[in-house]
Structures are given as C-alpha cells and as structure tokens.
C-alpha cells in the first residue's frame, strides 16, 4: 500500500525531492542538517578535524562616518526617476558627444573607440554580450 500511495503522490503533486526525507522518517541517528558548509572532516576513527582554511571569514568594511542608514522604511516614497534603460544610458553618456561630432562633421563610424566602444573583450573578467563577438 505504501508504494502505491507514493506513486500516486508523485503523479498528482509531481516529483518533490525536498519533502521526501525528513528527520521523522529516517532512523534516530539521521540528521538532515541545515545546509551549512563543512569546516572540517571526519577521520576513520570518527574524530572531527577542523581545517582553518575551510572556516568562512566574514569581511566587514569600516563604516565610520558613513551617512546612509542600513534600513529603508516601507513608508518611504517611491522613486521619482524612471528606470534606467540602454537608450537612456547611451544618451546620457555618449549621445551628446556623438551629436556634437555629427554637427561639426568630424564623426567617423570606424573610429568608435573614441566614444568607449570596444571591438573585442580580450582581457575582460566578465564577457558582455558574448554572441556579438567572434569566438
């Protein structure tokens, strides 16, 4: 009966692997844990050895003289500025310079590096728009 009910539950609810095994369903020695990272290892004799390199270290910046508060109230008014779009960013950064060069007649499409265009992303840590560049 147990097998049929589990199959029926799988068909009705879908495959739910997280709810399958709990501490109530396992043996008394079963402890699922909370998903914390291990900071050491168990030896063959069952002794736990703590490894200093595996212990997480939290780096907290010095916030003396920092003006902003760490909490934003839910009663704070919503922002009045429109969300940033690619066109808006372009028009605020490079657009005026290109328009000025077009009016003066000095704009050359093959000299886009002057405006910050990068033809390749060699040496970059993060590749932006990888489909636009030749691999």
Curated annotation (Swiss-Prot):
Cross-referenced InterPro entries: Ribosomal_mL41 (IPR019189)
Main localisation: mitochondrion
GO CC annotations on file: mitochondrial large ribosomal subunit; ribonucleoprotein complex
Keywords: Apoptosis, Cell cycle, Mitochondrion, Ribonucleoprotein, Ribosomal protein, Transit peptide
GO molecular function terms listed in the Swiss-Prot or TrEMBL record: structural constituent of ribosome
Localization: Mitochondrion
Transit peptide range per the UniProt entry: 1-13
Annotated function: Component of the mitochondrial ribosome large subunit. Also involved in apoptosis and cell cycle.
Family according to the record: Belongs to the mitochondrion-specific ribosomal protein mL41 family.
Protein name: Large ribosomal subunit protein mL41A
């Amino acid at each position: 009966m147990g097998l049929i009910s589990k199959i029926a539950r799988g068909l009705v609810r879908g495959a739910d692997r997280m709810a399958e095994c709990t501490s109530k369903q396992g043996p008394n020695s079963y402890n699922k844990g909370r998903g914390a990272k291990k900071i050491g290892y168990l030896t063959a004799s069952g002794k736990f050895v703590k490894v200093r390199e595996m212990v997480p270290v939290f780096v907290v910046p010095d916030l003396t003289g920092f003006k902003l508060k760490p909490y934003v109230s839910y009663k704070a008014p919503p922002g009045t500025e429109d969300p940033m779009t690619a066109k808006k960013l372009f028009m605020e950064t490079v657009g005026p310079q290109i328009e000025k060069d077009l009016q003066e007649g000095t704009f050359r499409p093959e000299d886009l590096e002057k405006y910050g265009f990068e033809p390749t992303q060699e040496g970059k840590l993060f590749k932006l728009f990888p489909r636009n560049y030749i691999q």
